[in-house]
């Protein structure tokens, strides 16, 4: 099935960034976070509440929609971990 539509306010990039805490823990993750939120917004604008507005578009499928919403939950954790690892590694040289 198609995941719940976050609502016209919920798909806004600024709302997404706030919800994910973009850059709050780690400024280096801000760029990745912003890019993700913009992509997510475009996805929802294109695909709508149930993918119907993107007829024939391969991007509007439930698997991708679920992946987008799942990614928003895991993205920042992963980014922060990666950044921390890079900083740690860079400091060793």
Curated annotation (Swiss-Prot):
<keyword id="KW-0964">Secreted</keyword>
<feature type="disulfide bond">
    <location>
        <begin position="16"/>
        <end position="37"/>
    </location>
</feature>
<keyword id="KW-1015">Disulfide bond</keyword>
<keyword id="KW-0354">Hemolysis</keyword>
<feature type="disulfide bond">
    <location>
        <begin position="22"/>
        <end position="33"/>
    </location>
</feature>
<comment type="similarity">
    <text>Belongs to the worm cytolysin family.</text>
</comment>
<dbReference type="GO" id="GO:0005576">
    <property type="term" value="C:extracellular region"/>
</dbReference>
<keyword id="KW-0800">Toxin</keyword>
<dbReference type="GO" id="GO:0031640">
    <property type="term" value="P:killing of cells of another organism"/>
</dbReference>
<protein>
    <recommendedName>
        <fullName>Parbolysin P2</fullName>
    </recommendedName>
</protein>
<comment type="function">
    <text>Cytolysin that shows hemolytic activity (on bovine erythrocytes, HC(50)=5.75 mg/ml). This hemolytic activity is completely inhibited by small unilamelar vesicles composed of PC/PG, PC/PI and PC/PS in 1:1 molar ratios (with at least 100 mg/ml concentration).</text>
</comment>
<keyword id="KW-0204">Cytolysis</keyword>
<dbReference type="GO" id="GO:0090729">
    <property type="term" value="F:toxin activity"/>
</dbReference>
């Amino acid at each position: 099935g198609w995941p719940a539509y976050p609502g016209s306010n919920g798909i806004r990039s600024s709302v997404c960034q706030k919800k994910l805490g973009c850059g709050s823990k780690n400024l280096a993750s801000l760029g990745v976070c912003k890019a993700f939120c913009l992509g997510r917004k475009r996805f929802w604008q294109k695909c709508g509440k149930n993918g119907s507005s993107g007829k024939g578009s391969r991007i509007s499928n439930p698997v991708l929609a679920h992946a987008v919403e799942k990614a928003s939950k895991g993205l920042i954790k992963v980014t922060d971990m990666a950044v921390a690892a890079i900083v740690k590694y860079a400091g060793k040289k």
